[in-house]
Amino acid sequence: MAKSSWEGNCFLNFFNNKSSSGKDDKTIFKSKFTSPYKLLKCSYDQEGRCILPILHTAGGLVGGDLLEFEANIGINSKVLLTTSSAQKVYGSVGRSKINPEGTFSSQKTKISILDNSHLEYLPQETIVFANGLYSQEFNIKISDNSSFLFTDLIRLGRSSAGESIESGVFRSKLEIMRNGNLCDDWEFVDQIELTKFSFEAKSGMDFKPVFGSLIWICEKEFPITKISYLKEKIKIIFKENNNYLSLGTLENGLSIRFLGTSSQDARKCFFSIWTQIRTVCGFCKPEYQGVWPLQDL
């Protein structure tokens, strides 16, 4: 019997192709992928950063779908990974008489960031429709003198239709480890489960359907004064925003949470914070990507 679910995988290997003359300093990549993954044309900014949008051609996930994504960021590389559209998770609970409790769709992501490299992984939002079941896992390994920026934006249900997650479940697990000379050290661990209960609870989402996380892991020797400056800039962004935001200081980086009713507000907020992170790191100002929603401009 033919399988009705997707099992797709994508493997990306990035490396710096700086020539001996030093004139051509940019990050290039090799890839291997299966449906429903597809890679759009990459582009480069003034720093030679490889900007690669990833497309999910199936239009969404249903129960039983499994996606596996792996990226290796080689030495002296700069990479911006994003997606060309929001990831949609369709309802699974109650759809089958054989399996009425539904089946989780899942995505597993594994990333390795080698010396003096910088990865920005900024996928568009994940929309979990009513009764959708979705699980995602991220396993990140990063060297001492590299950095990692990650955003994760979740919307529960279609608010315009009065829909919430109902009997659905969203689960997320993020593990970031620092590759040491003698042993690996835990840098950051985060586990989240969102259900109808957490959506409605006063101590949870309080009926606000949009939840987002921005995690920034910097180099181990990154100046504390620059982190303090960045925190003050982020607090100014918070004051200009009418949503619920929190800022946490990590051993080497920052953790930011967003809770509100508008995905657009979340994207704009995270873009402003991203701009400030680029500034304190001495990188060029980020540009709005053509695959992102035009209404945010």
UniProtKB/Swiss-Prot annotation:
InterPro entries, per the entry: UreD (IPR002669)
KW Manganese (keyword) present: no
Keyword annotations from UniProtKB, A to Z: Chaperone, Cytoplasm, Nickel insertion
A cellular component term, taken from the record's GO annotations: cytoplasm
Annotated localization: Cytoplasm
Pfam families listed in its UniProt record: UreD
MF terms (GO), sorted A to Z: nickel cation binding
Tree of life domain: Bacteria
Physiological role: Required for maturation of urease via the functional incorporation of the urease nickel metallocenter.
Family classification: Belongs to the UreD family.
Quaternary organization: UreD, UreF and UreG form a complex that acts as a GTP-hydrolysis-dependent molecular chaperone, activating the urease apoprotein by helping to assemble the nickel containing metallocenter of UreC. The UreE protein probably delivers the nickel.
Official protein name in the record: Urease accessory protein UreD
Gene designation per UniProt: ureD
